Design a protein with these regions (language model features):
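Alpha-helical transmembrane segments and membrane-interface helix-loop junctions
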Residues: 1-196
């Protein structure tokens, strides 16, 4: 079990690193969206490539941060019932959901998206829009994002089984302290203090 927990912690570190880098793409998406709107309104000009880059980045945020979101226990769930249960009952529900819903769904998405990406890459497919971008980078995000989610699902499964076996702490409890938004604000403050 200790070996699996070490693997789980490495997966956690990977998704934490990816999440901390990728959530800065939100700022880039906002700036690009604002820039596109300003250029379109002031200069009556538009670029399909810039519009497509906007959805590439937006897709990257959601797909690449799916594992990080699972790590932080921030995915949408129905807490009305589960929140009233004991920690062990919650862990059992998570184990069941991971084994019978999350992992099969992720496996199907990886299985379907990998050939979709490969075909696009091998055929050098580009967008049908005039001035559009190549499609394979956006399509590569799908299997990578679901692979990160699968890895994190495995990590969460290991941590919950360890908790149920009495060999690890409650993995849900550690995420109740700070929301992701609070941590982002704290990180921005630390960066600002470091520059002054």
């Amino acid at each position: 079990m200790q070996g699996l927990l070490k693997v789980a912690h490495r997966i956690d570190a990977l998704n934490e690193l990816v999440g901390r880098w990728v959530y800065w793409l939100v700022l880039i998406v906002v700036l690009e969206s604002a820039g596109n709107a300003i250029v379109r309104k002031l200069f009556n000009s538009s670029s399909n490539a810039l519009l497509e880059m906007q959805w590439y980045l937006f897709s990257a945020v959601f797909l690449l941060c799916a594992g990080w979101t699972l790590l932080r226990n921030e995915h949408v769930r129905i807490d009305i019932i589960q929140g009233r249960l004991s920690a062990k009952a919650q862990a059992w529900i998570d184990v069941f959901g991971t084994v019978f819903f999350l992992m099969p769904m992720v496996a199907i998405f990886i299985w379907l998206s990998w050939p979709w990406f490969l075909r696009t890459y091998q055929e050098h497919e580009i967008s049908g829009s005039a001035g559009g971008l190549i499609l394979w980078p956006a399509r590569l995000l799908v299997p990578i994002g679901f692979m990160l989610l699968a890895l994190q699902g495995f990590s969460e499964l290991v941590k919950r089984v360890a908790f149920l076996a009495g060999k690890g702490p409650d993995p849900i409890k550690r995420h109740d302290a700070h929301a992701a938004e609070q941590e982002l604000v704290e990180e921005i403050r630390r960066m600002a203090e470091g520059k002054s």
